[in-house]
């Protein structure tokens, strides 16, 4: 009985985690959001200058905007096209 409950709990946790990852993966698969190729692992520690650099280089890559995110530190390029939220 205990093994069945543990197995069910593991399956439930797996489904919850995979659902959250799938939403993020869908955005990346549709090319709605990707990490800036010119600034991999960019910490955006320069505040306005870092955010401006992120935005400019993402636009150079064809995105509509670039956004600095802090967890984990990186520069994300975002596209606005049908299917992207």
From Swiss-Prot:
Protein keywords: Antimicrobial, Disulfide bond, Fungicide, Plant defense, Secreted, Signal
Top-level taxonomic group: Eukaryota
Signal peptide coordinates: 1-29
Any single GO CC term annotated in Swiss-Prot or TrEMBL for this entry: extracellular region
UniProt-listed GO biological process terms: defense response to fungus; killing of cells of another organism
Subcellular localization(s) per the UniProt record: Secreted
Disulfide bond entries: 32-84, 44-68, 54-75, 58-77
Stated family: Belongs to the DEFL family.
Protein name: Defensin-like protein 11
């Amino acid at each position: 009985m205990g093994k069945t409950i543990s197995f069910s709990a593991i399956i439930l946790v797996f489904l919850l985690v995979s659902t959250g990852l799938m939403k993020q993966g869908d955005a990346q698969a549709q090319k709605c959001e990707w990490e800036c190729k010119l600034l991999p692992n960019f910490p955006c520690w320069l505040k306005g200058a870092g955010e401006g650099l992120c935005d400019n280089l993402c636009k150079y890559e064809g995105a509509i905007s670039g956004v600095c995110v802090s967890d984990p530190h990186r520069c994300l390029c975002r596209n606005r096209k049908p299917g992207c939220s």
